[in-house]
A protein has these predicted regions:
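Catalytic machinery of carbohydrate-active enzymes
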Residues: 1-280
């Protein structure tokens, strides 16, 4: 039996859906197909349970694109569709499909509508889509299982030594924590922790998400304002401080903290960040 997930959005949206998709595959023993934008399809390399990706640009699809998608979802024998997209076109397409169970937050094509929680960690909010089909969902318990080769390659890229490894991942966008502070922070830490190893990486992208996930998993702690690196750290179970992110949008787990400032990230001092890292 097969399940179809329609998941619009960017790479962060895809990563946040990984635990829910994995839960359906594991608990129902369904084969999984995912429709998502081609630019973010690389994220699904992280989940071997996905048997097929259907590249689809939800935001600017033509009528011909929708017709092609209908053809794709009519051919396999799908028993379930979890629809995170919205709009009349997707409803028309699904209403003409032969999928008997169609779950969505809204839309006339849904055989059952769900009410996702607002607030909290978005990955856990998808539990609302799984409850009607008897699938339990604890996103915080999910962990990525990465290929041994990818982890070995990541380890080879880290600084030599046996001290704790701090991975820095700034977003590199206007309003980010100032670049000079990112660069100076490791030196500040080494005054009390001489063996610290550190590496700064630019923003993650979907095309290289496996490599970034492996770098995160090979580290001891992550300091990030890059949203994709943050989500990967959560799914790898690596301690993390997320700059610019409210703690309520993160799982309530030891070692995971959000750090914000009312007037912007440039108001955060190195001491604020050190305290969040437990190094003050």
């Amino acid at each position: 039996m097969r399940a179809l997930f329609l998941i619009p959005g960017d790479a962060v949206d895809q990563v946040q859906a990984l635990p829910a998709v994995a839960a359906v595959a594991q608990q129902l023993k369904f084969a999984i197909q995912v429709a998502c934008a081609p630019a973010v399809a690389g994220v699904w390399k992280l989940l071997p349970a996905v048997e097929k990706l259907i590249p689809f640009n939800f935001g600017d699809a033509s009528l011909a694109d929708w017709a092609n998608l209908l053809g794709s979802v009519r051919e396999p024998d799908f028993q379930l569709c979890i629809n995170l997209a919205g709009g009349r076109q997707v409803d028309l397409m699904l209403s003409m499909s032969h999928i008997p169970t169609r779950l969505a937050a809204a839309g006339f094509s849904a055989t059952q509508k769900v009410n996702p929680a607002t607030g909290g960690w978005p990955a856990q909010a998808l539990a609302a889509y799984l409850q009607p089909i008897g699938v339990s969902h604890d996103a915080d318990a999910f962990r990525l299982v990465l290929p041994r080769e990818a982890l070995a390659e990541a380890t080879s890229r880290l600084p030599a030594g046996d001290g704790p490894m701090l991975l820095l991942s700034p977003a590199g966008v206007p309003g980010d924590w100032p670049q000079q502070r990112w660069q100076e922070l490791p030196s500040r830490i080494r005054t009390s922790l001489p063996g610290l190893r550190s590496l700064e990486l630019g923003p993650a992208d979907a095309a290289h998400v496996l490599e970034r996930a492996a770098m995160v998993a090979a580290s001891d702690v992550v300091l990030a304002s890059d949203p994709l690196s943050e989500e990967l750290a959560l799914l790898c179970g690596v301690p993390m401080v997320a700059l610019g992110r409210d703690g309520d949008s993160l799982p309530q787990r030891p070692g995971v903290k959000g750090l914000t400032a009312a007037t912007g990230l440039d108001a955060l001092t190195p001491e604020d960040v050190l305290a969040a890292l437990g190094l003050a």
